[in-house]
Curated annotation (Swiss-Prot):
The C-terminal cysteine-rich domain mediates interaction with LRP5 and LRP6. Pfam families: Dickkopf_N, DIKK1-2-4_C-subdom1, DIKK1-2-4_C-subdom2. Gene3D superfamilies: Lipase, subunit A. It is found in: Secreted. Interacts with LRP6. Interacts (via the C-terminal Cys-rich domain) with LRP5 (via beta-propeller regions 3 and 4); the interaction, enhanced by MESD and or KREMEN, antagonizes Wnt-mediated signaling. Forms a ternary complex with LRP6 and KREM1. Interacts with KREM1. This is Dickkopf-related protein 1. It comes from the Eukaryota. Residues 189-263 are annotated as: DKK-type Cys-2. The gene is DKK1. Keywords: Developmental protein, Disulfide bond, Glycoprotein, Secreted, Signal, Wnt signaling pathway.
Length: 266
């Protein structure tokens, strides 16, 4: 009888201990708290800098970073790295090489996003693919849209400026034949094929214009290493057919720094 009583007391003691452990706040709730905290961790991050103060538990947006449109490729502001360049050919098809700000450091150029139709330009490379620069404005390369784009843009740009157009027609039309006309001396260009016969496309300041191909006896530039022409602000054309750029004969005895190169017969 005493043995049965002792066994019963043991069972009661074990049951009490189990009940006490099951009701302990640290043991009974710990698993639930861990699960809740883990599942809501992303929602309870502190707000970003510049966020509203006093709301530490506000949700963090999962939207991607803001795109920076002024560089060689669309990148987030945090990752944006401007790509330095010396000429347009070093940039992508939808970019051009120029100083980032007007009046900025003239010695620093980066690849900038191309300009869309009806935006101002100084050369063809500034306009996005499918457009080209005409009279300082990016217009469509499609001949069917050429006349309408120019007329509409000129009307919008100068239609309300009476002092500028005093004595002149408010609407200017351009013949579609101009689309096929090769650039003359001084015209903006992208490559030599844009210029008329006897001209080449060469750098002039930070743009390119059509310049005369050099003739016999004219001063030329001899490039000692490949790619050095990209550093010239006032680039010369190449020598004409049958000519090459050589040191002028009467300057053979001069110092290396003062040697003069001219276009001479082979």
């Amino acid at each position: 009888m005493m043995a049965l009583g002792a066994a019963g007391a043991t069972r009661v003691f074990v049951a009490m201990v189990a009940a006490a452990l099951g009701g302990h706040p640290l043991l009974g709730v710990s698993a639930t708290l861990n699960s809740v905290l883990n599942s809501n961790a992303i929602k309870n991050l502190p707000p970003p800098l510049g966020g509203a103060a006093g709301h530490p538990g506000s949700a963090v947006s999962a939207a991607p970073g803001i795109l920076y449109p002024g560089g060689n490729k669309y990148q987030t502001i945090d990752n944006y790295q401007p790509y330095p360049c010396a000429e347009d050919e070093e940039c992508g098809t939808d970019e051009y090489c120029a100083s980032p700000t007007r009046g900025g450091d003239a010695g620093v150029q980066i690849c900038l996003a191309c300009r869309k139709r009806r935006k101002r330009c100084m050369r063809h490379a500034m306009c996005c693919p499918g457009n080209y620069c005409k009279n300082g404005i990016c217009v469509s390369s499609d001949q069917n849209h050429f006349r309408g784009e120019i007329e509409e843009t000129i009307t919008e740009s100068f239609g309300n400026d009476h002092s500028t157009l005093d004595g002149y027609s408010r609407r200017t039309t351009l013949s579609s034949k101009m689309y096929h006309t090769k650039g003359q001396e001084g015209s903006v260009c992208l490559r030599s094929s844009d210029c008329a016969s006897g001209l080449c496309c060469a750098r002039h300041f930070w743009s390119k214009i059509c310049k005369p191909v050099l003739k016999e006896g004219q001063v030329c530039t001899k490039h000692r290493r490949k790619g050095s022409h990209g550093l010239e602000i006032f680039q010369r054309c190449y020598c004409g057919e049958g000519l090459s750029c050589r040191i002028q004969k009467d300057h053979h005895q001069a110092s290396n720094s003062s040697r003069l190169h001219t276009c001479q017969r082979h």
